[in-house]
Swiss-Prot record:
Keyword Hydrolase: yes
Disulfide bonds: none
GO terms, molecular function: IMP cyclohydrolase activity; phosphoribosylaminoimidazolecarboxamide formyltransferase activity
Domain MGS-like: 1-148
SUPFAM superfamilies linked: Cytidine deaminase-like (SSF53927), Methylglyoxal synthase-like (SSF52335)
Family of the protein in this entry: Belongs to the PurH family.
Native organism: Histophilus somni (strain 129Pt) (Haemophilus somnus)
Designated name of the protein: Bifunctional purine biosynthesis protein PurH
Upper taxonomic lineage: Bacteria, Pseudomonadati, Pseudomonadota, Gammaproteobacteria, Pasteurellales
Cellular component per GO, a single term: cytosol
Catalytic activity: (6R)-10-formyltetrahydrofolate + 5-amino-1-(5-phospho-beta-D-ribosyl)imidazole-4-carboxamide = 5-formamido-1-(5-phospho-D-ribosyl)imidazole-4-carboxamide + (6S)-5,6,7,8-tetrahydrofolate; IMP + H2O = 5-formamido-1-(5-phospho-D-ribosyl)imidazole-4-carboxamide
Amino acid sequence: MQLNHPIRQALLSVSDKSGIVEFAQGLVKRGVKLLSTGGTAKLLAENGIPVTEVSDYTGFPEMMEGRVKTLHPKIHGGILGRRGIDDEVMMQHQIDAIDMVVVNLYPFAATVAKPDCTLEDAVENIDIGGPTMVRSAAKNHQHVAIVVNNSDFNAILAEMDQNRNSLTLETRFDLAIKAFEHTAQYDSMIANYFGQMVKPYFRAEEEAEAKCGQFPRTLNLNFIRKQSMRYGENGHQKAAFYVEQDVKEASVSTAKQLQGKALSYNNIADTDAALECVKSFSEPACVIVKHANPCGVALGKDILEAYNRAYQTDPTSAFGGIIAFNRELDEDTAKAIIERQFVEVIIAPTVSSAAQEIVKSKKNVRLLTCGNWESAIQRLDFKRVNGGLLVQEADLSMVDLADLEVVSKRQPTKQELEDLLFCWKVAKFVKSNAIVYAKNNQTVGIGAGQMSRVYSAKIAGIKAKDEGLEVKGCVMASDAFFPFRDGIDAAAKVGIECVIHPGGSMRDQEVIDAANEHNMVMVLTKMRHFRH
């Protein structure tokens, strides 16, 4: 079996035309004849590139406003024909072999993302001929190269030069995988979009409204493997890191690594927790995370001050932690970190060249930049359970001063309100049951992941005491309501003066009474932030 087949004829039909003119010129320069359709053929001809319209080749015009272009035996016979097996039938029906197919599909995702997109708009952007050609060419990858990514153009031309106008079987197989990934993702987008819709002419209007939403009846996900890992959460577990395509928001998935060892499974999980927390703050902020829990968070006039204050919360836990900033990492801050502690990962929107030079002295430290961010983009969160997948909206909601309800007799001061909001933002990122003590925009003690809320409160106090931090005058945040007054009593005992929590317990009044007995401020958010 001949493994390499010279490319003599190619069919080009693309929606994304970036780079297609240069690629077509490169093919013609290498003696390849071109077939093309509609807008692609017009663009090539306008640039002086010799091209044959598919309709001229098949003798059958494009019809139905372009719905039928390439669905013809002379096209699919040329793509699917097996060299050395189907030659006679191809000759009998005057079918020329097509050795390369260059196709990308109608922009369905971009169309349905438009606020004014109608169902009719979506339907007209469902590609039929394109996926059919892609699948045909990918199926016959033994003989045909299928190109769906414009980013592959240069590499393909370079390989053709090295292989007498051929591509290796290994390359054609890799291109076929990309093609099936491309069509799978495309069909998934369509299925997800239609799965969210129930038209009123199918059901009663009220039921249709209830059924509509962002959760389709079948969920199709497409992620691309970015990294294979030495192991997973533990050494005996195999693991890999997959990312979504075209993510615009600054994230651990889109971050650029400037130096250091490859990120581990736990590094990525912890870095995500640190970065998402620090993104909550507009002032210069630092978040230090260990095992996906913040162990120190603070604001400052600059990130050096924020780092020093965050580290002060729990230096023991900060050892081997992840540090995230919401401003550029500068030389002074980088120096303070490297001289003070062992750190696994540092992530910031940008890193100054001087800071990068400082961090280079510790070659194993993973240094990442994620770019700047604006407001958070709504997305879905997933949690795998045995045999299923829990799906929910990401918890992006926060409260501001206007949302707070003061239920205690004592009213908070301006500084106390500022600290309460700071503390509440941190509590959102602490594993439940979560209790956070803070003062002057600095965490003082954090109690995480306890089965009872009162023990989280006690642990926050113990942590503060162990580090010699003053709890008296601090505020306290709880990610969920206090079911009993014991958490308030425990907090008052160590000197907490203000409490923020969602409220909503059957015993709310008992909890409020406890706050009043201790002359504490109590503020309700009416929003819970469980984190499991």
